[in-house]
């Protein structure tokens, strides 16, 4: 049985949560004033008791977003994954069905794994040809104040998007695992956060165009700065070393007729990722009633 389940349907012409269930360690908050009056959207805050996921916890969520509805799934703070007890793995499974002309926006705060933590996450989205989806999935390096940097044991995040009759549209897996040869921190170098953003659907067409253009311009500037710095260093020192950008983003399309856009990010700070998400998703404010990550 699922740990949590929410159904959003049209009632009297408005998006309404017609069913909401959750049990320990999960809790859903659906504030009625999350968006201004007149905004047709349901905001769903996913919360865990104790502010995090304990070793061995298993959370399973199901969301159904009916035809023409708009819903947001978010969090109040980062999802903390506490230290593992032995080989126990904390896991979180999310499955969502998005109806015709519906929009689901999944904009959580990042996952933060404590030292030795083991975490597995799988998110499955089932869409129709005219469904719309915004998905943000990201992780930080850990608790900086405690001197932890990519110090967890295991992290695996799967995001699968299916179209119509279970036709694979977008399949993605991120795996970070401790190895005896090279640690996660060594492989991640100085980057403190990695993120992925998915934008799919006709309702997001203009935002997709803007994000693609913004990422292109940002990375062009980064390359120019890196080249200038490299040239300056080569003139002043024979031991030239390429300067790694503090923020990297890439953008590509997927799906039929390029209806989907995926953005991948690596940054040396969590705050710069927050800033990027605020800027790129700001155009959603009229639809959602408030700007994501505001």
Curated annotation (Swiss-Prot):
Description of the deletion phenotype: No visible phenotype under normal growth conditions, but mutant plants cannot grow on medium with urea as the sole source of nitrogen.
Swiss-Prot/TrEMBL keywords: Chaperone, Nickel insertion
Entries under Pfam families matching the protein: UreD
A cellular component annotation (GO) from this entry: urease activator complex
Family statement drawn from the similarity comment of this UniProt entry: Belongs to the UreD family.
Binding partners and assembly: URED, UREF and UREG may form a complex that acts as a GTP-hydrolysis-dependent molecular chaperone, activating the urease apoprotein.
Biological function: Required for the maturation and activation of urease via the functional incorporation of the urease nickel metallocenter.
Name this protein carries in UniProt: Urease accessory protein D
Organism, scientific name: Arabidopsis thaliana
């Amino acid at each position: 049985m699922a740990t949590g389940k929410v159904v959003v349907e049209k009632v009297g012409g408005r998006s309404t949560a017609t069913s909401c269930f959750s049990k320990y360690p999960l809790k859903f908050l659906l504030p009625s004033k999350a968006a201004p009056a007149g905004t047709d959207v349901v905001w769903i805050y996913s919360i865990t008791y104790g502010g995090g996921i304990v070793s061995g916890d298993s959370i399973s969520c199901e969301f159904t977003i009916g035809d023409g509805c708009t819903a947001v799934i978010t969090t109040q703070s980062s999802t903390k994954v506490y230290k593992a007890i032995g080989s126990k793995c904390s896991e979180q499974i999310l499955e969502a069905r998005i109806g015709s002309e519906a929009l689901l926006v999944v904009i959580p705060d990042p996952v933060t794994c404590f030292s030795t933590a083991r975490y597995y996450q799988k998110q499955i989205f089932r869409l129709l040809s005219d469904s719309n989806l915004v998905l943000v999935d990201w992780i930080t390096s850990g608790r900086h104040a405690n001197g932890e940097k990519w110090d967890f044991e295991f992290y695996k995040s799967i995001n699968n998007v299916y179209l119509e009759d279970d036709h694979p549209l977008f399949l993605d897996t991120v795996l970070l695992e401790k190895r005896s040869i090279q640690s996660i921190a060594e492989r991640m170098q100085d980057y403190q956060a990695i993120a992925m953003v998915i934008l799919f659907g006709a309702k997001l067409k203009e935002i997709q165009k803007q994000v693609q253009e913004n990422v292109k311009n940002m990375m062009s500037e980064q390359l120019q700065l890196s080249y200038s710095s490299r040239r300056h260093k080569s003139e002043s020192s024979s031991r030239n070393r390429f300067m790694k950008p503090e923020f990297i983003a890439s953008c590509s399309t997927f799906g039929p007729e390029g209806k989907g856009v995926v953005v991948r990010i690596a940054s040396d700070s969590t705050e710069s990722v927050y800033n990027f998400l605020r800027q790129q998703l700001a155009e959603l404010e009229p639809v959602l009633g408030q700007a994501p990550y505001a």
